């Protein structure tokens, strides 16, 4: 009995909830139209959109590859420059060592030549001194002898002649 009462009480609600015959919602047809439109759109626009997207991917990949190539080239150049700098440092050190050795050798050579020149000058001085002494001695002897031989009044014996020569020489 209670079910019958509930049925009669719910009947007006069910009557108002039913269709009045005025508005008909066509959700199924609209959904099918949308899906059909989307399928046609995908069919015609998918290939150009996919090609556009793929060309963009290719451009980015090419740009990335060119950047990586430039990076590799710059690294190779950097390594080459670093090698050259290291070689230049080694060459500079070798040149410095060679210059130091040459300076030492040149100083020794100049010193040796100076010593040889000094020895030659001293030798020349001694020879010149001896030559001048002999020349002076000859001159003195010639002068004494010419004095002795020019004056006939003076007769000198050998001892006196030696004494006179010794006095003139000293």
UniProtKB/Swiss-Prot annotation:
Subcellular location as annotated: Cell inner membrane
Keywords of this entry: ATP synthesis, Cell inner membrane, Cell membrane, CF(0), Hydrogen ion transport, Ion transport, Membrane, Transmembrane, Transmembrane helix, Transport
Coarse class of the protein's main subcellular location: membrane
Parts of the chain that traverse the membrane: 3-23
Keyword Transmembrane helix listed: yes
Subunit structure: F-type ATPases have 2 components, F(1) - the catalytic core - and F(0) - the membrane proton channel. F(1) has five subunits: alpha(3), beta(3), gamma(1), delta(1), epsilon(1). F(0) has three main subunits: a(1), b(2) and c(10-14). The alpha and beta chains form an alternating ring which encloses part of the gamma chain. F(1) is attached to F(0) by a central stalk formed by the gamma and epsilon chains, while a peripheral stalk is formed by the delta and b chains.
Protein name in the entry: ATP synthase subunit b
């Amino acid at each position: 009995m209670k079910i019958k009462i509930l049925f009669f009480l719910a009947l007006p609600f069910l009557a108002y909830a039913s269709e009045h015959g005025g508005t008909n919602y066509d959700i199924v047809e609209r959904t099918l139209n949308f899906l059909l439109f989307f399928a046609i759109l995908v069919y015609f626009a998918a290939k150009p959109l996919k090609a556009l997207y793929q060309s963009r991917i290719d451009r980015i990949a090419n740009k990335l590859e060119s950047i990586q190539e430039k990076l590799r080239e710059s690294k190779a150049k950097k390594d080459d420059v670093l090698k050259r700098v290291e070689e230049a440092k080694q060459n500079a050190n070798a040149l410095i060592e060679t210059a130091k050795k040459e300076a030492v050798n040149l100083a020794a050579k100049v010193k040796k030549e100076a010593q040889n020149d000094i020895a030659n000058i001293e030798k020349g001085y001694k020879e010149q001194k001896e030559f001048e002494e002999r020349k002076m001695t000859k001159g003195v002897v010639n002068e004494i002898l010419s004095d002795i031989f020019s004056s006939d009044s003076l007769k000198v014996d050998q001892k006196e002649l030696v004494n006179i020569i010794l006095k003139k020489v000293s």
